[in-house]
């Protein structure tokens, strides 16, 4: 613990907490200050000046990052018949119906993404208390309730991320790994930023992006100047 604290102090000394860095500077600092012994994830965080209590100011969706996330996604699909075969052919890790519902209700959660065809939502709905709090419940807004299961599986395996503003207007997203080349992290960051900018509600007041930052797992939070994106 003492060693980790020493590493954190050293990392903090390299970052000016009062400064908003350009995206290129921020990415370079994330890589420079990372001290994790594993290939740490790189995440961005947005504090948006929105009121999620208003229906037209709720921000939620999905996108495919240009350079992927660097994370292997375990994809589970609820489908039957031809759609189940499509999902398997596309690379889904788990495909089933009631058998998967029983398994999940029994405590099994070894998957990262859940996709379902519309006709399967009646049985998937039984898992609301399990999947909902973990942000795993299939939803049309994120493209995880669909008849095109092959495309959904391929996108999930190829770098698709989902995002959602919490009650305080915060949005977090994985944009890659510390091992990524800096230019690939910058490209992913800019792609996500474009999505956030376009998601601005017409009724939002004041400065939309109150704060933007980037960090790595166990790393230092670094403020980013939105204008550099």
From Swiss-Prot:
> What are the GO BP annotations of this UniProt entry?
regulation of translation; translation
Single GO MF annotation: structural constituent of ribosome
Stored InterPro entries: Ribosom_uL1_bac-type, Ribosomal_uL1, Ribosomal_uL1-like, Ribosomal_uL1/biogenesis, Ribosomal_uL1_3-a/b-sand, Ribosomal_uL1_CS
**Keyword RNA-binding on entry:** yes
Family per similarity comment: Belongs to the universal ribosomal protein uL1 family.
Subunit-structure text: Part of the 50S ribosomal subunit.
What name does UniProt use for this protein?
Large ribosomal subunit protein uL1
Originating organism:
Streptococcus pyogenes serotype M1
Q: What is the lineage of its organism?
A: Bacteria, Bacillati, Bacillota, Bacilli, Lactobacillales
């Amino acid at each position: 613990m003492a060693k980790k604290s020493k590493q954190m102090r050293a990392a903090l000394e390299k970052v000016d907490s009062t400064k908003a860095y350009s995206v290129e500077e921020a990415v370079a600092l994330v890589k420079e200050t990372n001290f994790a012994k594993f290939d740490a994830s790189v995440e961005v965080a947005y504090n948006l000046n929105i009121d999620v209590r208003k229906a037209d100011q709720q921000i939620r969706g999905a996108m495919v990052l240009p350079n992927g996330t660097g994370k292997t996604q375990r994809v589970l699909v609820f489908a039957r018949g031809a759609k189940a075969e499509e999902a398997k052919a596309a690379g889904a890790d788990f495909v089933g119906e009631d058998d998967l519902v029983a398994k999940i209700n029994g405590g099994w959660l070894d998957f990262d993404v859940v996709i379902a065809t519309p006709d399967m939502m009646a049985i998937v709905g039984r898992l609301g208390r399990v999947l909902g709090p973990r942000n795993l419940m299939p939803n049309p807004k994120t493209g995880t309730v669909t008849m095109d299961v092959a495309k959904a599986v391929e996108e999930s395996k190829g770098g698709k991320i989902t995002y959602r503003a919490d009650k305080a207007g915060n949005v977090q997203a994985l944009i890659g790994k510390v091992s990524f080349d800096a230019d690939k992290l910058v490209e992913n960051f800019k792609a996500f930023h474009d999505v956030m900018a376009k998601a601005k509600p017409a009724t939002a007041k004041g400065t939309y992006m109150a704060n933007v930052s980037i960090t790595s797992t166990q790393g230092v939070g670094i403020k980013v100047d939105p204008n550099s994106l």
